[in-house]
Amino acid sequence: MESPIQIFRGEPGPTCAPSACLLPNSSSWFPNWAESDSNGSVGSEDQQLEPAHISPAIPVIITAVYSVVFVVGLVGNSLVMFVIIRYTKMKTATNIYIFNLALADALVTTTMPFQSAVYLMNSWPFGDVLCKIVISIDYYNMFTSIFTLTMMSVDRYIAVCHPVKALDFRTPLKAKIINICIWLLASSVGISAIVLGGTKVREDVDVIECSLQFPDDEYSWWDLFMKICVFVFAFVIPVLIIIVCYTLMILRLKSVRLLSGSREKDRNLRRITKLVLVVVAVFIICWTPIHIFILVEALGSTSHSTAVLSSYYFCIALGYTNSSLNPVLYAFLDENFKRCFRDFCFPIKMRMERQSTNRVRNTVQDPASMRDVGGMNKPV
């Protein structure tokens, strides 16, 4: 998919939003509406499509959405990372994976201002180096996020279905090692994005695009190959693993009443499993539309109507919105995160509440608070 500054040749359109450059064909999320010529080059001068008339309000709306994603996502994910580092009780295996997910989401939210500028200016004005960095962050986010969610699901499966093995496998240290391996694995794609990414002047429309640069004579081949690889390795296989893990967990949860030795541990186990399931489900809901859209476009089955293009932009925005949703989910679904968030945001209020609770506990903790002296109970 070309990363055209214009979705259709002949009329200005949104440029390749580099942080949307998650799927290749010069690795833009924007589909290659311009057809390739016989040599594989994209958008030849003799093959032009009628432009779709996109409302000027669409870039403004997208910019507003990305602004919210930027603020909520960056602040929220930074807060998640802070409380995991700050509070010892939060350094569990599951939370180590959550830290990794928050790091990837926080990084990708930093690209939102650049995306917004590209939508509004219809060109990439930030230079070649920043273009490479932004594209690389996109790829890192895409692969580290889905790989981390997959490992979180495997971690939950082991905790629920193999509690004895979980004692050795589910440790914070091993979770950290797995996170490092995830980033190293994602680097095979992220570093490639740095090498291939760059700016290109589109003289026919007088704009600059930021995208992966493939040889023109092999463009169509690389386009299809990269799209299929991304779809299979960054979506289909991880989602299938997640589905298998949660299917086995559901069967296990239905077959036994008590998973661990105590009801409190069992309740915590089910609560954390539910949290991970919701986070995974929201991720899949947010990213499935754009993956399907890209796959359909790669097969040449999309029309070039205004409605289709508008839907495409909505799918892109929905995918990036996921980066700001996870901190909200933690705050509502996990009591430990909720308590730590409140402790950070309202330290004085929380300190006063703890002092009040401690005073109440001290007054009722010992029923023998009266000492019998001379046949009479007197306060000590």
Curated annotation (Swiss-Prot):
InterPro entries: GPCR_Rhodpsn, GPCR_Rhodpsn_7TM, Kappa_opi_rcpt, Opioid_rcpt. GO terms for biological process: adenylate cyclase-inhibiting opioid receptor signaling pathway; behavioral response to cocaine; cellular response to glucose stimulus; cellular response to lipopolysaccharide; conditioned place preference; defense response to virus; eating behavior; estrous cycle. Signal peptide: none annotated. CDD domains: 7tmA_Kappa_opioid_R. The chain crosses the membrane at residues 58-85, 96-119, 133-154, 174-196, 223-247, 275-296, 312-333. The keyword Cell membrane applies. This is Kappa-type opioid receptor. It is a multi-pass membrane protein. It comes from the Eukaryota. Residues 1-57, 120-132, 197-222, 297-311 are extracellular. G-protein coupled opioid receptor that functions as a receptor for endogenous alpha-neoendorphins and dynorphins, but has low affinity for beta-endorphins. Also functions as a receptor for various synthetic opioids and for the psychoactive diterpene salvinorin A. Ligand binding causes a conformation change that triggers signaling via guanine nucleotide-binding proteins (G proteins) and modulates the activity of down-stream effectors, such as adenylate cyclase. Signaling leads to the inhibition of adenylate cyclase activity. It is found in: Cell membrane. It comes from Rattus norvegicus. PANTHER family: KAPPA-TYPE OPIOID RECEPTOR, NEUROPEPTIDES RECEPTOR. Disulfide bonds join C131-C210.
